């Protein structure tokens, strides 16, 4: 049996950020219409904080596909000259059970997670937003910035913070313009990129904040946040992770990608357990907002949060798009 395989290089050549955003937004809408199935995540830590893996799976009936994505994070790979994030997506026919193809997982993860953060901002942030803050300088950061510029091309300033090493943020900020051009064909000549030395000041001046760290302790405090701010919380994808102060959830508009997963392993997990967020104040899943089944931002002073743990459905949709394009 000859099973098609799409490498990371082929993903980069054949998948635009516009494609990733379209695939991702379509999945959110299908999920809101009960046209998807998400199965429980399998997670295991080989060395807590340094080496772990997860397997996420799902079913897209309209595309007649099911499958899974396995991703492993191996911090020590950097010293071995290997990528620290390794993954593989397997796509199967739901009509025959036959494998349709394999796709590199890490490159697709970057694109669809970037798309998720940006779509959350598209539907919840103020339309006149000018300043954005990206908290985290890891693999995800370029994808988040590229996707955000696709849905907010009028952004004036994008600040980048590494809460544990401001030097990394400065270096990243100096390189990101060239990365956007080379990797995403995005011209960002009118955007100012800045490395952050004072996180509190940067938070207080930001309209859109995207968090993409593996933090288990809050990095952003409630008193730093100005009225009208939007958060796309992408990093908290396993139980115990927390990027923003749970007190922020006392008076916010909250949407999630998958309610069950976010309850157990998203940014809302700890606020729900602590009681700073109640179930009845979760407005719905993002697809509900996109389809007009739920109300989002009501005023320019509302603080909004999109909690995304990530779903295999997104990976499968993007992988299916690539496999069909490659036939």
PLM feature spans:
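NAD(P)-binding Rossmann-fold cofactor-contacting core
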Residues: 151-185
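Rossmann-like adenosine-cofactor binding region
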Residues: 187-271, 276
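Glycine-rich adenosine-cofactor-binding loop
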Residues: 117, 128-152, 162-164
